[in-house]
Amino acid sequence: MQIAEVILHTRHLADQTAFYHRTLGLPLLAETADSCTLQAGTTRLRFQETASEVLYHLAFALPCQTFQAAKAWVRERVPLLALTGSPQVYAPTSPLRAWHKAGEDEIVFPLIQARSFYCGDAAHNILKFIAYEDLRQEAAGAEGAAAVLHVSEVGLPVADVRALAARLQEALGIEPYPVSRPIAEDFAYLGDIFGQLVVVKLGHPWLPTQTVRATVAPVHLTLSGPQAQQLALAPYPYTITVTAS
């Protein structure tokens, strides 16, 4: 599943523009009085100004061979988020079975052969950088924003995870990721190694914290797919446009 465009809201437009463009180095494609559009690998990332405080989970994919270099590069520019919780945490109910230790700044996902690190952006959204062993695109010399492949995850908090997951599966033909995992009551990844919709129960803590909890905020996604369609996920402010690829 390819995420071509992500449109999110923010109450802190100037700060977000500065963070993603100047701090992280994403190319700035367009800027207006009430929005900014950036390029995150192959994904367009747009922030639209709003009067409300909102919170999102967003992930950038990295080639696995650049993970440590990218982590060091980001850490020089913004504090990484440390894991909170018990001294040793194993999440057997998670779709991805994450291993991590409190106080560390990296999570390993053995089931999908991936690892990630996290930071907060200028509006305190949870920003994840993830590298899969099976994504080994050529990245010689790439550093910083140039190493970002695409937006790989967008969070969609809901009251009933299984109900929305079923709607997405039927409408978009996407499956749980990895395919061997059933849909959990509080958390589901839908998609593939290239992109996932993270359907999570309202109030669920976003890793790596135990205190930043999932809330509803407007999301518009453009995906590449076999057939063009529009999907509105009422009663939530989530809309998906699929363009035929």
Task: Put a short name on every predicted segment.
Residues 1-3, 9-29, 40-87, 96-102, ...:
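Glyoxalase I/VOC metalloenzyme domain signal
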Residues 35-39:
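Minor-groove-contacting beta-hairpin "wing" of winged helix-turn-helix DNA-binding domains
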Residues 89-91:
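Short proline/glycine- and acidic-rich turn/helix-capping motifs at secondary-structure junctions
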Residues 111-114:
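Short, small/polar residue-rich loop motifs at catalytic or cofactor-binding pockets
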Residues 116-118:
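Short hydrophobic/aromatic beta-strand element in the GNAT-like acyltransferase core
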